[in-house]
Design a protein with these regions (language model features):
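Surface-exposed, low-hydrophobicity beta-strand/loop segments enriched in small/polar/acidic residues
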Residues: 2-161
Length: 161
């Protein structure tokens, strides 16, 4: 039977958190219409536990501010067409695997949350905010990726019957 040292086991599932912050004044854009992009890399062998979208300040540009969150395989795999101006998230509201807000996409289901938790290779999680219309003077969105990577992995033993 496989054995795992208790001390190692106790510390093997510490969650890790990556925060991506999108702001209307990133990269001296000064709120101009366009696409704001951000990404973070989750290491190989990690399990994604949650991807959250927090609205600190609503985006106030002219026509629209639309957020997608996904990865390199599917840019909107987690969340699609999130209106950052007010209708989908108000200030201090959160989208998460447990509060989908009707914005879930291919990687997330109503029934059981995320479908693609584990990846054997490193995975780039990305977000894009597309703004249209007049220049924004406010807007801050935080995307939180919570993941865990075991420090030990125990494989089963097999004995033929």
């Amino acid at each position: 039977m496989a054995q795992l040292d208790k001390q190692t086991y106790k510390s093997s599932w510490n969650p890790n958190v990556a925060e991506m912050v999108m702001s209307y004044d990133d990269d001296s854009a000064a709120g101009a219409a366009g696409v704001y992009s951000i990404s973070t890399v989750i290491p190989a062998g990690a399990y994604i536990l949650d991807v959250q979208v927090h609205t600190d300040t609503l985006w106030d540009n002219g026509t629209s501010a639309t957020l997608i969150v996904g990865d390199s395989d599917d840019p909107n795999g987690f969340y699609d067409a999130v209106n950052a101006k007010a209708t989908d998230l108000v200030a201090n509201e959160v989208l998460s695997f447990y509060h989908l807000g009707g914005k879930e996409e291919a990687y997330v289901t109503d029934d059981n949350g995320v479908m693609t938790q584990y990846a054997s290779t490193a995975r780039t999680i990305s977000a894009q905010m597309t703004t249209v219309g007049t220049t924004a003077t406010a807007g801050v969105t935080r995307i939180i990726v919570i993941w865990a990577k075991p420090t030990d992995s125990v494989k089963s033993d097999f004995t033929a019957s």
